[in-house]
């Protein structure tokens, strides 16, 4: 069972915590993580791109010239694909890019990412993370005290913390139920509180 140090908001040690081995100590499954990333990014696509085919282009109802006797190739409509201003063949149409993924696979992907963070020593645990008011300076000081640098993903339900992180470059604050595979992979450091760990273990256990 992984045992990590807990840090308070001033950067001092506040004890240790035992992490669930089945969540924070498994062998990461890269293929499942890859599938989860593809699924999440695909779900964000609008899927609204569209072009007009020959039936949607205005006009072209009349046959340009008679079928036989002109010496020219037969044509049925000036909106056929081979004409300038004609419709498009096999063009994009509105569609949904959402992909299905079993719940067990989605949870395995999240467990794999969390386990990799522990293995890489990129998981930082705070005893708590609260601010009395939205103060970017105070949140930056807390991260500096914890010796956190680079791209940082902070998991907190505190509204003041979420607002304080908006002006910090390379820092993103998400609620506990907003923790996802794409952000966890994209940001090098992951900052969790003890309460966040308990809720994560309740969901993924």
UniProtKB/Swiss-Prot annotation:
Biased composition (Basic residues): 60-71
UniProt keyword terms in alphabetical order: Ribonucleoprotein, Ribosomal protein, RNA-binding, rRNA-binding
Key word Manganese present: no
Pfam families tied to this protein: Ribosomal_L4
InterPro entries per UniProt: Ribosomal_uL4, Ribosomal_uL4-like, Ribosomal_uL4_dom_sf
Cellular compartments per GO CC: ribonucleoprotein complex; ribosome
Protein origin, superkingdom: Bacteria
GO BP, sorted A to Z: translation
Molecular function terms, GO-annotated: rRNA binding; structural constituent of ribosome
Chain spans, region Disordered: 45-97
PANTHER family assigned to the protein according to its UniProt record, in alphabetical order: 50S RIBOSOMAL PROTEIN L4 (PTHR10746), LARGE RIBOSOMAL SUBUNIT PROTEIN UL4M (PTHR10746:SF6)
Family named by the database record: Belongs to the universal ribosomal protein uL4 family.
Subunit-level organization: Part of the 50S ribosomal subunit.
HAMAP family: Ribosomal_uL4_B
Function: One of the primary rRNA binding proteins, this protein initially binds near the 5'-end of the 23S rRNA. It is important during the early stages of 50S assembly. It makes multiple contacts with different domains of the 23S rRNA in the assembled 50S subunit and ribosome. Forms part of the polypeptide exit tunnel.
The protein's name: Large ribosomal subunit protein uL4
Source organism of the structure: Lactobacillus gasseri (strain ATCC 33323 / DSM 20243 / BCRC 14619 / CIP 102991 / JCM 1131 / KCTC 3163 / NCIMB 11718 / NCTC 13722 / AM63)
Encoding gene, per UniProt annotation: rplD
């Amino acid at each position: 069972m992984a045992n990590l140090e807990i840090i308070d908001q001033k950067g001092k040690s506040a004890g240790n915590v035992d992490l669930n081995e089945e969540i924070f100590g498994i062998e990461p499954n890269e293929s499942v993580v890859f599938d989860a990333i593809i699924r999440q990014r695909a779900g964000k696509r609008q899927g609204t791109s569209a072009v007009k085919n020959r039936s949607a282009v205005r006009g072209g109802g009349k046959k340009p010239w008679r079928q036989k006797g002109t010496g020219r190739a037969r044509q049925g409509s000036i909106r056929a694909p081979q004409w300038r201003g004609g419709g498009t063949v096999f063009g994009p149409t509105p569609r949904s890019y959402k992909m299905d993924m079993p719940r067990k696979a989605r949870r395995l992907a999240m467990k794999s990412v969390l386990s990799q963070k522990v293995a890489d020593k990129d998981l930082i645990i705070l005893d708590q993370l609260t601010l009395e008011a939205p103060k970017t300076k105070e949140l930056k000081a807390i991260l500096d005290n914890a010796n956190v640098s680079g791209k940082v993903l902070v998991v907190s339900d505190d509204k003041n913390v979420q607002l304080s992180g908006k002006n910090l470059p390379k820092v993103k604050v998400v609620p506990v139920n907003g923790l996802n595979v794409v952000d966890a992979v994209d940001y090098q450091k992951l900052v969790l509180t003890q309460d966040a760990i308990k809720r994560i273990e309740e969901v993924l256990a």
